[in-house]
């Protein structure tokens, strides 16, 4: 990569409250912090602006969320210090870290002790991670009770998706499976994801909808169709995430996080089902006490 990777836009500093009653114990299952000891790696696809924990806390209070899952961003590589520092002192925050084949067992154990419950694999942006090699990684993290989180376009993985069914850990797909929404519910990769989800071999995050196509009603309608198909397949293995501070989203497309949460209510008008997606399912996947 030559030159400085493009600078990210800042998130909306004035999130509005959602238009529905958010249940107690609701969890944001996908956010990032850009602030702390971890340097941004040279080979990265964007340059993050500071996005500190106090700003996220303000967002949480405004949206009525009390639990959260911080996800290691690609720009920090395998330096998980900022991510772990965020969650180490707060049992209401869990972490998803990034490791590689050289990460020793004692580091994995240390990450777990600091609140890590899973690891993320980036299969986008030129990553050479392959499904065959992920089976070995899944075996390494199984002893720690972790899940494997996939950032990858399921439409590009369609002929290998069934391999995930044999993994010894839960497999979680970011951002609806990160396919272009216009490809629709009949895309072979998405139908493979639905099959995994329906059989209980996968989880899906209803997050990052604005990453799936150009802003506008056509993308909104296509995303709603994807959401409906996922809900029909298995609502008990769906979770929601804000994706705050929305890295690499242009300023003119930067969403207000109240609208991001309201989108969930549009996809899931049933109150009891929203409670499962916001409270019960995250408690089961990430190990929160399900007392809400």
What is the predicted role of each segment?
Residues 41-89:
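Alpha-helical scaffold segments that flank or form the walls of functional sites
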Residues 27-31, 68-71, 94-97, 117-121, ...:
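Hydrophobic faces of well-ordered beta-strands that scaffold small-molecule active sites
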Residues 2-11, 75-162, 205-217:
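Active-site gating/metal-coordination segments in enzymes
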Residues 2-25, 49-67, 235-237, 251-292:
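Mid-to-C-terminal alpha-helical segments outside catalytic/metal-binding sites
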């Amino acid at each position: 990569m030559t030159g400085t990777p493009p600078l990210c836009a800042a998130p909306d500093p004035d999130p509005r409250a959602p238009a529905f009653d958010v249940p107690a114990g609701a969890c944001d299952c996908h956010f990032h912090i850009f602030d702390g000891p971890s340097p941004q790696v040279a080979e990265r696809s964007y340059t993050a602006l500071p996005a500190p924990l106090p700003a996220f806390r303000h967002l949480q209070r405004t949206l009525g969320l009390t639990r959260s899952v911080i996800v290691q961003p690609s720009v920090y590589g395998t330096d998980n210090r900022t991510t772990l520092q965020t969650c180490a002192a707060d049992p209401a925050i869990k972490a998803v870290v990034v490791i590689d084949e050289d990460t020793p067992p004692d580091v994995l154990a240390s990450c777990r002790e600091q609140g890590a419950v899973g690891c993320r694999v980036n299969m986008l942006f030129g990553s050479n991670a392959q499904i065959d090699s992920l089976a070995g990684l899944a075996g390494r993290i199984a002893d720690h009770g972790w899940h494997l989180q996939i950032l990858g376009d399921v439409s590009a993985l369609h002929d290998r998706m069934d391999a995930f069914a044999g993994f010894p850990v839960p497999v979680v797909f970011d951002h609806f499976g990160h396919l272009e929404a216009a490809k629709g519910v009949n895309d072979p990769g998405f139908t493979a994801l639905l099959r995994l989800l329906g059989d209980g071999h996968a989880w899906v995050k209803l997050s990052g909808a604005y990453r799936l196509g150009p802003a506008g009603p056509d993308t909104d309608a296509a995303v709603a169709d994807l959401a409906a198909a996922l809900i029909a397949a298995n609502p008990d293995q769906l979770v929601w995430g804000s994706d705050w501070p929305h890295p690499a989203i242009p300023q003119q497309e930067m969403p207000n996080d109240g609208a991001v949460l309201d989108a969930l209510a549009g996809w899931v008008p049933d109150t009891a089902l929203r409670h499962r997606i916001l409270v019960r399912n995250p408690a089961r996947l990430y190990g929160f006490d399900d007392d809400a």
